[in-house]
Amino acid sequence: MTEHDALIEAAQQVRENAHAPFSNFRVGAALHATSGRIFGGCNVENATYGLTVCAERIAIFKAMSEGERNFDAIAVVADTDTLTPPCGACRQLIWEFCGDIPVILANLKGKTETLQMHDLFPKPFDSSNL
């Protein structure tokens, strides 16, 4: 099993914990730290949609809360026919906390695609803009 396969599997597993009673759109993410640790996250919806948190952000926040600061890949899995890339807010956080890492997109049908973060987020707002 490759590192990317392991991340996809971890994202698939954590996706099962998603709380999506309104959209039924369950997403899992798995973030790989350079230490070798994998941090999973699933989306958590709220009746006030603005309080909903995406799987990618939860994975990042979980890793950060446990002291990790260096990451080299993230996988995002959803049960869709097409692949589901991170939303704009997640792209901003991935860029700021992870940099130009590979983003592995996968669905439950076995389709995958790996993109570099700079392809998903070509003109980021970051500390150089401040």
Please name every model-derived segment:
Residues 24-33:
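Short beta-strand scaffold segments in enzyme catalytic cores
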Residues 2-17, 66-130:
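C-terminal binding/interaction regions
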Residues 19-22:
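Short Gly/Pro-enriched turn/cap motifs at secondary-structure boundaries
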Residues 26, 43, 75:
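Conserved beta-strand segments that form the floor/walls of ligand-binding pockets within enzyme
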Residues 42-58:
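Compact, glycine-rich, soluble single-domain proteins
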Residues 37-38, 112:
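Hydrophobic "anchor" residues
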Residues 40-41, 105:
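General beta-strand structural signal in soluble alpha/beta enzymes
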Residues 58, 62-66:
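Feature captures the catalytic cores and cofactor-binding loops of soluble hydro-lyases/lyases
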